[in-house]
Amino acid sequence: MPEVSSDIDSFKVVINPEGIVGQTIKVNRSLFEVILLSDKSHKIPIQNENKFFCEASGLGIPKKIFCDVDLTLGDKDFELKQKIYSSGLGGIFPKGIEIGSIYEIQDLTPKEVRIIIDLNADPLTSNYFGVLL
């Protein structure tokens, strides 16, 4: 059985050919436990090209994450189909990796909206994954 590098531990980025899928949360010998971006308990700091930042949470639906945005905190510049990137804040995910695009904008209250983001990477379309060290 191949030996796993000691450099690989929890909180490493997991990718497939389409992009970021999630991150490692546990490594045991040659097995990696991965939490997907779309998992309800996962969060990832994101941004768009207009410097809108948000901490997105998994929606619990395949390939979907969301941000709840308080519209009273200033101008928010986002729109449907706009590309979303990893912000690099938090130190786990590299800055500037395209992770998806805005799929839907839902009004929660007159002062708050929910942005639904459709992720680029689908973990079900690949049998091969990489771990960024």
Question: Where is each model-derived feature located?
Answer:
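A secondary-structure micro-motif
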Residues: 1-133
